[in-house]
From Swiss-Prot:
Entry-linked InterPro entries: Phage_head_morphogenesis_dom
Domain of life assignment: Archaea
Pfam families linked: Phage_Mu_F
Name this polypeptide is given: Uncharacterized protein MJ0329
Species the sequence originates in: Methanocaldococcus jannaschii (strain ATCC 43067 / DSM 2661 / JAL-1 / JCM 10045 / NBRC 100440) (Methanococcus jannaschii)
């Protein structure tokens, strides 16, 4: 399907009926859809043409992604087709899905009707015509009339929200409607409508007054057989005592609940007698929710790009925390001060540096600084040639020795990758078995209720296995395990726990979809377990293996850097086609890790570079 051909129904985020939901979503959009970067998952450098092409796609479809995200939050589900938004509220919208064991996934058939102007007379209002759209597997094309607009289902993405936020938001909105439509009118009625009291000791007059007031209308005239001394009327009005503070409090708590439910924050600003909702401060815990949403949308984009032929490309949105860069600069300043003290006191502050500066934006520890730009690399090389900044460049003799050393280091890096792959495969098997066993043991309701806590407990067990059965034995075989102190191990395990949890969580979606569908259809536990096993056969752990390889390499380099922290080391690349051009130029650069910790590899995602001491 081409961009200029598809004409899905034009829609807008119609949340005007509820200002709080509208405002919360708008604020959330600004926090999630931040400036982005485009990277290759396998670490290869992307060409400028590919980056420009992907950027153009994302920029053209950012509105589609926002619309899909609003459906994801408010309806629990959304649809994208080659990054185009599909509106589930379209006329005659119908969806069917079927498990295809050959493809190992659900196949969808979606049909709906849209209004479209006649292209030849588009300026005329009355030329709109109904167009039936069908998105289904190509082998079903023959079962639909020739005049339908048919699209191949393989480009379709259907994404479910495993957390029923939409139900929570709907419940909060229903409570607000109850407040607005039932409670508030009664309050106004009690405060604004006058209460008329008739007072008399005459029994007959009292009966007439009672009947008259029960049917009272404006301008009503009633004859009462009694003298003015026998009957008295009083009118009570408490309009001046309307409990506005109570109403304000009720509405404030409603707005706050909506904002918190959608994962943002709220403060009240009063201006010109009106209340405006705005986001002034963003709590750290809420920011984690926002980053979780970012990762979800990044996953959608990666899935859609892969369907469109752009395999292995990831679009990464910038960190939404406005104070993140400031915090990083403050930490970097403290690191610089400690390094300066090292030179004076001749004391190794590396452990303290690791405590102060444990991670970067992506949760990666000191051994994984952000990648260097081409300009930064050229500057470093110039300094090395001039002998400035504590940098040198290996001469011809050192280069020959380095080449011999590189071949042995290449074997070590290859070994680390194999160990990472082995763990990824084993852990994926454990994950699948854990889901099946936990479902059979707890059942659907308890599993869904405690899902996050259960998954984190499983992740901690896998991290322990990763360290005890894979990392420690490997480092020990390389005779560098003793250089890894307990404090660093604790930092690493904490980092692995979050990194692996995110990956397990992304894999969980397919299993949770099967569970939810089974419960909705009323399937028995045996049938649901059977369907889970079908999905399990087709789930691959490639992302987990890739991340495990990354962590093995990072741990190896961090441990090596600690051993040679105050010694001269040489930057070594693998010198194959996977090496980034900028990293290739760094091959042979000599530096001291204590003076240049930012040069300790890996530099960026998928980097396999390492270091070796000059004396070797």
């Amino acid at each position: 399907m081409e961009d200029d051909k598809i004409q899905m129904e034009t829609v807008s985020i119609d949340l005007a009926k509820d200002t709080a939901v509208n405002m919360a979503l708008r604020i959330l959009f600004t926090q999630i859809f931040t400036p982005y970067s485009i990277v290759s998952i396998d670490g290869k450098q992307l060409s400028k043409d590919v980056i420009d092409e992907i950027s153009g796609l994302i920029d053209r479809h950012i509105r589609d992604l926002q619309l899909a995200f609003s459906d994801f939050l408010l309806k629990g589900k959304c649809y994208l087709y080659k990054l185009h938004y599909i509106n589930p509220n379209s006329m005659n919208f119908k969806e069917r899905k079927h498990w295809n064991p050959q493809k190992g996934r659900y196949e969808y058939c979606i049909t709906y009707t849209i209004k479209r102007n006649n292209a030849e007379r588009w300026w005329e209002v009355d030329t709109e015509e109904d167009v039936r759209v069908v998105i289904a597997p190509m082998e079903l094309r023959q079962h639909f009339p020739a005049d339908v607009e048919f699209y191949d289902e393989k480009y379709l993405g259907v994404y479910y929200n495993p957390i029923p936020i939409h139900e929570t938001i709907q419940e909060i909105a229903d409570q607000k409607n109850t407040l607005a439509l039932k409670v508030l009118p009664l309050m106004v009625q009690k405060t604004l409508i006058p209460t008329i009291i008739g007072i008399t000791q005459n029994t007959k007059a009292g009966e007439i007054i009672k009947k008259a007031l029960s049917n009272h209308q404006n301008r009503t005239r009633v004859y009462i057989p009694a003298t003015p001394d026998e009957v008295k009327f009083e009118t009570i009005s408490i309009g001046k005592d309307i409990p506005t503070d109570l109403i304000e409090t009720m509405l404030y708590y409603y707005d706050s609940a909506i904002f918190m439910g959608l994962g943002t924050s709220i403060s009240i600003v009063k201006a010109s007698g009106q209340e405006l909702t705005t986001s002034r401060t963003v709590d750290r815990n809420i920011l984690r929710i926002v980053q979780g949403y970012q990762q979800e949308i990044e996953r959608w984009i990666a899935d859609q790009l892969e369907k469109m032929g752009y395999k292995g490309i990831w679009v990464k949105f910038a960190n939404p925390d406005p104070d993140w860069e400031i915090n990083m600069l403050q930490k970097a300043k403290m690191v610089a001060e400690l390094k300066a003290q090292e030179q004076v006191a001749k004391y190794d502050f590396s452990a303290l540096i690791e405590r102060i500066f444990p991670s970067n934006e992506f949760g990666e520890i000191l051994a994984a600084y952000p990648d260097l730009t081409e300009k930064e690399v050229e500057k470093l090389l110039k300094m090395a040639k001039e002998g400035k900044g504590g940098l040198e460049y290996a001469d011809e003799e050192k280069q020959k020795l380095l080449e011999k050393k590189r071949k042995s280091l290449e074997k070590i890096i290859s070994k680390l990758e194999k160990v990472g792959d082995k763990f990824g495969k084993k852990s994926m098997e454990n994950f699948v078995n854990w889901i099946l066993e936990t479902y059979e043991r707890l059942g659907y309701n308890e599993l869904m209720q405690d899902w996050d806590e259960l998954l984190r407990e499983f992740t901690r067990e896998e991290v322990d296995m990763f360290f005890l059965d894979y990392v420690a034995p490997t480092l020990n075989s390389l005779k560098i395990y003793d250089d890894l102190d307990q404090q660093t191990i604790d930092i690493l395990k904490q980092h692995w726990e979050q990194a692996f949890y995110n990956i397990y969580s992304s894999y969980s979606q397919q299993f949770l979809d099967v569970l939810t569908e089974g419960i909705q259809k009323g399937l028995g536990e045996e049938e649901i377990a059977k369907n889970l096993k079908k999905v399990a056969k087709d789930v691959k752990g490639s992302r987990l293996q890739m991340r495990a390889r990354e962590e093995m390499n990072k741990t190896y380099n961090l441990t090596r850097a600690r051993r040679f922290w105050n010694d001269k080391v040489i930057y070594v690349t693998m010198k194959d086609e996977r090496v980034r051009p900028s990293h290739r130029k760094l091959h042979g650069l000599i530096f001291v890790p204590a003076e240049r910790p930012e040069l300790v590899p890996p530099l960026g995602y998928g980097c396999r570079c390492t270091i070796t001491p000059v004396r070797d």
